[in-house]
Design a protein with these regions (language model features):
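Juxtacatalytic substrate-recognition/specificity segment
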Residues: 1-107, 159
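Acidic/His/Gly-enriched intrinsically disordered linker/tail segments
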Residues: 57-88, 96, 100-232
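C-terminal single-pass membrane-anchor helix
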Residues: 219-270
Length: 270
């Protein structure tokens, strides 16, 4: 379809056609807009084994999507609800959009944070509110985030969420233009640090410190306590409902027993 070539296995024809159309009209990438007019090959792997084979087994077992910007290829593990697959597709397309726009690699935390923001993966941020490490004041730096993104599933989930918070902070600093000023400077800047200096007049180290403070203020112990409070409030409401139900049931049983006892007494009197 158009510039998009979709590769799928039997039984996937409908979703392949639908996703090919999504790719062909993909737009709205923060600070970039539409995907550059390059050919794209979308491969939908029907099984984990096939996905691992297509990605040459180089990705972690929790991976369900991969983008190869130099080749213009996106590979998805096409298993599960279509809405979840659509989010994964948007995430991988964001990788293509960013790399094609900048022309080179940028720090991993920015690449993954950008893709998470572009795909509107806000549920990742909700999980941070229950992160006990952040709640008790443990601070990760951006290198820690990069390592987490390459780690096990649990570490990677935290890494994706923290990367998204870093990109969202840069987005807020851009005002109504969002990430556009930074992304306008990135292609010409020699380094990511140079782009930050040109856009926000700060070094990457300065940004890291401000980002750490921002995370602490948003996901510190107060946020954790509030999130846990809602959880326990819900549990408490369920327990209260169960207790009230049991009391009503016991009262009904006692009433029935009392009535039976009264009838027995009447029969005896007769």
């Amino acid at each position: 379809m158009g510039r998009v070539t979709a590769v799928a296995w039997p039984g996937q024809e409908a979703i392949a056609a639908s996703f090919a159309e999504i790719v062909d009209h993909a737009t709205g990438f923060p600070g970039i807009g539409a995907l550059p007019d390059h050919p794209i090959r979308l491969i939908l792997a029907s099984t984990r084994q096939r996905y691992d084979s297509l990605t040459r087994g180089r990705l972690p077992l929790w991976s369900e999507g991969a983008a190869f910007p130099d080749a213009g290829v996106v590979v998805l593990l096409a298993v599960g609800p279509s809405d979840r697959l659509a989010v994964a597709l948007r995430h991988e397309l964001a990788h293509l959009a960013l790399r094609w726009h900048v022309g080179r690699q940028v720090p991993l935390w920015f690449e993954e944070g950008y893709a998470a923001v572009a795909a509107e993966e806000w549920d990742r941020l909700d999980a941070l509110r229950l992160n006990w490490q952040l709640a008790r004041g443990v601070r990760m730096n951006l290198d820690d985030v990069d390592r987490a993104l390459r780690g096990a599933r649990g570490d990677a989930e935290t890494g994706y969420a923290l990367a998204a918070t870093a990109v969202l902070l840069l987005h807020r600093w851009g005002g109504v233009r969002g990430l556009a000023p930074l992304l306008a400077n990135l292609p010409q800047a020699e380094t990511f640090d140079a782009a930050l200096r040109a856009t926000y007049h700060m070094t990457e180290g300065d940004f890291e410190q401000r980002w750490q403070r921002d995370v602490a203020s948003r996901y510190g112990w107060l946020s954790w306590a509030a999130a846990m409070g809602f959880f326990w409030l819900a549990i408490g409401a369920i327990l209260v409902a169960l207790v009230m139900f049991r009391r009503r049931r016991d009262q009904a049983r006692r009433a029935a027993l009392d009535e039976g006892q009264l009838l027995d007494e009447l029969e005896i009197d007769e």
